[in-house]
Amino acid sequence: VPPRTPIQRGLSRRTLLAAAGLGTAALGLSACASGPGSGVTAIRFFQTKPEVVGYFDEIIARFHEAQSAIRVVHDSTSQIAPMFVRGNPPDLALLNYDLEVARYIPRGVFSDLSDMPEAQRIQPSVQALVDQYATYEDTTSVLPYSIAAEGVIYNKALFEQNGVAVPTTWSELLAACDTFTAAGVTPIYSTFKEPWTIRQGLFDYSVGGAIDVDAFFTDLAAEGSDISETSGTSFQKNLADPIDKMVQLARFSNPDAGSRGYSDGNLAFAQGTAAMLLQGPWAFGEIAKTAPDLDLGVFPLPMTEDPADLKARVNLDLAAWIPEASKNQEAARVFLSYLMSPEIIDAYNADNLGFGVTTDAPAATDPKITALQPLIDAGAFYQGAGTYIPNTIPVMNYLQATVRSGDGASLLQTLDADWRRIAVRS
């Protein structure tokens, strides 16, 4: 692991806050010694989520109206890897947090944010999501900003018309699918043409609803290259039951699932052709373009016979980090504090169907997602199994073949072999 580079300072935080008219009390930042330089400090803000680029442009404009010491340049088009390769990372990033971002943490290239008051406001169960992928010494390299919680989107009218209650056990889920099938309603609209939808939905929900995902991958890593059907932990040993159930659920899909993609699924679901859709909250806006008044809800996919086992799939839809190589860390911290002020972060999550990450965050109020709030509050959530699998393993292609063939055993054998191969080379 390379040593951490010293912080390169431009204007001090005290100078920036004073010039910005955003006092330390307002932003909760302590002062520090002054550094060289004066005038306006420009920082590059890396945020590429396409549906909220305009949203953050508006936030940046409001920040500029409130002060004149810091100018934020919104970079929404770059790629993370080339920036680090060229030694030109942004001053502040607010991105989806996944395994590809997490691989930078052990290298010590993100600055430690643990001394920021905002870090103390993060729910411990949410901050733990960061550590599940990677850690670096005793530091806080990434601050969560927004959680996207996912489950089964369902058409409330179709459930009511067919006398189906929201299932809370595996047997109830199967019974619901049988009822819809008998009534001529497609139980689950699937979009197997785009394999990411299989990984995010059927695979992640099936596995996450049945096992402790993080514990499984922790134990799998401990096995090293000694992974097989008979080892203490393996895909074949631990995932056999959830994958068998995944294959069962796939059979309740629309007959043309293999030729239908994400957009097709949103349109068909909006037209009322299916009762359930295994997608995240990002699908709501697309569905609303066709059926703005469609009454929808969401529930966690039940994979056991105990309702107490219900969990939501989550991902850190946005998380913040400041590179050590930034020459404007103090200014970046000021803007990050602004972004994490309750009036900004809470409004963002409310407007974008996200769940809050702070101890004082208000509960979600949109009726489409409120059913997941108790699970978020209780920490009954998991990051999808597919997100732990490196890109060097083409799991999405494997899953696409599995839902077509129904051969879950071959999938698990292949995953064990691929994982073993990577472990040998590591």
Go through each PLM region and give its residues.
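Glycine-centered hinge/linker elements that transmit conformational signals in sensory
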Residues: 220-257
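Conserved N-terminal structural module of periplasmic/extracytoplasmic solute-binding proteins
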Residues: 2-103, 107, 118-120, 258, ...
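Conserved C-terminal helix/tail region of periplasmic/extracytoplasmic solute-binding proteins
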Residues: 2-3, 160, 378-426
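Short helix-initiation/N-cap motifs at beta->coil->alpha
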Residues: 75-82, 170-174, 257-270
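Periplasmic-binding protein-like
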Residues: 296-320
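Hinge/lid segment of periplasmic solute-binding proteins
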Residues: 98-150, 174, 201
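Extracytoplasmic/periplasmic solute-binding protein
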Residues: 141-143, 174-228
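Mature extracytoplasmic/periplasmic domains
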Residues: 110-115, 266, 271, 281-289, ...
